[in-house]
A protein has these predicted regions:
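HDAC/HDAC-like amidohydrolase catalytic core signature
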Residues: 1-180
Length: 180
């Protein structure tokens, strides 16, 4: 039996910045990456770093219509975040790794099919791009997404609303209580 290996990909997108005190900031990932590095986890033979490449236009356009134009919307940071997921999924499906963890930003679950710009700090729906990649490249059909975030993954839900082969579960704050 092959030993379990975990694929790890990291895209901090330090150029994707809101106000200095905004919670969705590069510091969130930089701090986490620093803790992972200090802990020695990266030295374990069971960890494999997976290099991210920007998601290609075909992968993005399998999900999104970018207005006013593709390059104005699909900039490097969101393309790298989506591409990291694609690389990690390819590594898993090829058997190179057993599972994976993607430490990426910007987030994506608020982005709808038609993308006019940032919506809830999301430009491209990373997970929707991944789903279409899995279907097109790897011929996977039935897929489940479990979105755990303080906010509802409304963009992902909207994209897959009429898809009978996709189960979408969003566990989020209801507004009357603390998360969840």
């Amino acid at each position: 039996m092959m030993p379990l290996r975990t694929g790890l990909t990291y895209v901090p997108s330090v150029d994707w910045v809101h106000e200095s005190d905004h919670p969705e900031s590069p510091e969130r990932l930089l701090t986490t990456w620093e803790a992972i590095t200090r802990s020695g986890i990266l030295l374990r033979a069971s960890i494999e770093l997976i290099e991210a490449q920007p998601a290609g236009r075909d992968s993005i356009e399998a999900v999104h219509v970018c207005l006013p134009e593709f390059d104005a919307i699909a900039t490097e940071s969101p393309r790298m975040a989506a591409g990291a997921l694609l690389a990690l999924a390819d590594a898993k499906i090829s058997g190179r790794v057993s599972n994976g963890f993607a430490l990426i930003r910007p987030p994506g679950h608020h982005a709808n099919r038609i993308t006019l710009g940032t919506r809830g700090f999301c430009v491209l729906n990373n997970i929707a791009i991944l789903v279409q990649h899995l279907r097109i490249k790897h011929r996977l059909r039935r897929i489940a997404i479990i979105d755990t975030d303080v906010h509802h993954g409304d963009g992902t839900q909207s994209i897959f609303w009429n898809d009978p082969d996709l189960l979408f579960i969003s566990i989020h704050q209801d507004g009357r209580t603390l998360y969840p």
